[in-house]
Amino acid sequence: MAYEIQEAKELVVKAGKELIEKGLIARTWGNVSARISDTQFVITPSGRAYEDLTPDEIVVVNIDDCSYEGDIKPSSEKGVHAAAYRHHPTVDFVIHTHQKAATIVSITGMTVTNVYDEFRGVLGDTVPCAKYAMSTTEPLRKNVEECIIENPSARAIMLMHHGALVMGDDYDHAFALAENLEACCDKVIKDNYLRHSWEKTYSDDAKRAYFLDKNGAGKMPESICDLGSSVRCSNTFTLTVGDKTLDVGTDNGVGVNGIAPKVEKIHRAIYNATGCTMIKHVTTPDVVAVSCTGEKMRPMIDDFAQIVGLDVKNEPWINGDTDECAKAIAKAAKGRNAVLIEGNGALVFGNTEGDIQALEIIMDKGCAAVVDCDIFNRPHYVPKAECFLMRTVYLAKYSKQIDE
């Protein structure tokens, strides 16, 4: 049964906060909707952070043509939600997420068949994957609708290179679908590693070791150089390395209140090359593992192409020759928001704390995708033309909108 409009709006706001708490979405990614009649639903607005949403900002949309009421623009994926309501009359709550494990499995393009018994009661027998099309586009809506029509019993579907769509009878059912889908896909990833490696038990460390050995990239480093984090203000930046913090001039690299460490050259070079105001060293295990390969990254996920760049270079850490190292890293940073440092993780850079948080999440998810899809032997990449379009649109519009 459809919700009353005010209850629907309040539940959509509540869902956004709960999805963040459960780690199924972040920042403004994904979207949530609730049916209010046979002809209308309410949905989250475009480009607004879930933490600050109010019921007054939730938009009423017509199922038939996706026209909407008011001055607030609805989510650009409203057509995907409309398709779910159109083809499933009993569905009253829809969530589109960019959840990690489901997104990684979506990259393979394969349907999850014979869903594990422990998840089958919620997910059904299969979880199909909609064919790829660029996010927010009419081709994506058509591909998702085609997948829904061809799999009428599926209430959870994956969107290739993108994320997942769950279609619940109500709020609780939608969340059960999203959580069971993530747990199911996580198990698919782990079981795939066990099949390929012939190991009897799973561990994250063993999986990364298998990935590195498979790619002739040695072993995970026993220690990682602290490349520091910093925040720029005008012609100086505050650099933190370990437990030490000092101010450094962006023009001359001179420490204002102490002797600047060698890594200041790298930070200064990135600031001068990109114009960013924040830099952070990311050393999550999957990011370190991918940095050990010495190979650049290409986008496997739409979010990565939009927010990080068309690729991410992997530059060697030349200990003791930091002028050359800083120059190479600065060159690799241009036009991007991250650079891998061989054997030492990555540096991400942006203009707000929100940018840095998003970049950390996406680099970690993107590197996990590199590891897992390599083991699947299905490293499918987002087409270059779509990467270019998404990156251009994001830089021009979306990144400005979320900071307003």
Region spans (language model):
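Glycine-rich flexible loops
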Residues: 1-404
